[in-house]
A protein has these predicted regions:
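FAD-site-proximal beta/loop scaffold in flavoenzymes
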Residues: 1-9, 89-164
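Flexible, glycine-rich terminal cap/loop adjacent to redox cofactors
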Residues: 163, 180-191, 196-264
């Protein structure tokens, strides 16, 4: 396992440009490894806003991480050589960070009347009930946001619904998510890509943190770049004040997203 390594490898290939892949790519680069980060999609963190992907990739590349966005890995040879669409890359270690799949096969769920999707995620409603209303499912196996805090929220709702009044609901739309890179990334709700696909009418409000006086002083003393100070985008339902989604990139983004979650 990756977390059982006792020495920092000279080079490492990381497959997957999601939150875990980006976080560990930056960590390993700072520890001294030559890092190759592969993502089949055109951008890192493909589920997030485009400005997040651009800013994060730029930051990683400034630190020496070689980012292979839009470069699908075709195979691995000898446990050390990555063969991708762009070429061949030899690394001392390879980390696969391509997400999780449910381990539900063989549980006999179909015999219990529990339906699953094609991948094996049990189908659940807003109260966490499967298609067998006496059986609940929570956590990563459901295929929803695979975050510790989301599973915790599901567990609290499960206790309420299974043992007491069946009234608790869990909404992934109001569950925040963070990626602990530098700059830090945090988001909640929908992105512009999602709303465009849904043809939802919305208005966009944006703000660069370096427009704040406090940041301007820090910028003069530290000589940092503008994108390092942060940027926020808030999406609001057109003609109203309902927040549909928000994204922040910058220092303490995971903390700064909290008021927006409350407002939603």
């Amino acid at each position: 396992s990756f977390f059982e390594l006792t020495e920092c490898p000279d080079s490492i290939a990381i497959l997957g440009g999601g939150a875990v892949g980006c976080e560990l790519a930056q960590v390993m680069g700072r520890l001294g490894s030559k890092v190759h980060l592969f993502e089949a999609a055109d951008t890192l963190l493909p589920a997030e806003e485009d400005f997040v992907s651009r800013t994060l990739q730029s930051s990683l590349e400034k630190e020496g991480v070689v980012v292979h966005a839009g470069d699908r890995v075709e195979r691995i040879e000898d446990g050390r050589t990555i063969i991708s669409q762009s070429g061949s890359y030899e690394c001392h270690k390879i980390l696969v960070a391509l997400g999780r799949q449910p381990n539900t096969e063989g549980l006999g769920l179909s015999a219990l009347g529990v339906k699953c999707d094609a991948v094996g995620h049990p189908l659940i409603d807003s109260k966490l009930r499967t298609t067998n209303k006496k059986i609940y499912a929570i956590g990563d196996c459901t295929g929803h946001y695979q975050f510790t805090h989301f599973a915790d929220g599901q567990a609290r709702a499960l206790v309420q619904n299974a043992l007491f009044a069946n009234t608790a609901k869990v909404s992934s739309e109001k569950t925040p998510r963070s990626t602990y890179t530098q700059p830090e990334v945090a988001a909640v709700g929908a992105s512009t890509q999602m709303l465009d696909q849904q043809r939802e009418a919305y208005e966009t409000y944006e703000y660069f943190f370096d427009e704040l006086d406090r940041v301007k002083v820090g910028k003069l003393s530290e000589g940092a770049h503008r994108e390092d100070h942060g940027f926020v985008r808030v999406l609001v339902k057109r003609g109203g004040d309902q927040i549909l989604g928000a994204t922040i990139i910058g220092p303490n983004a995971g903390d700064d997203i909290a008021p927006l979650v409350v407002m939603m």
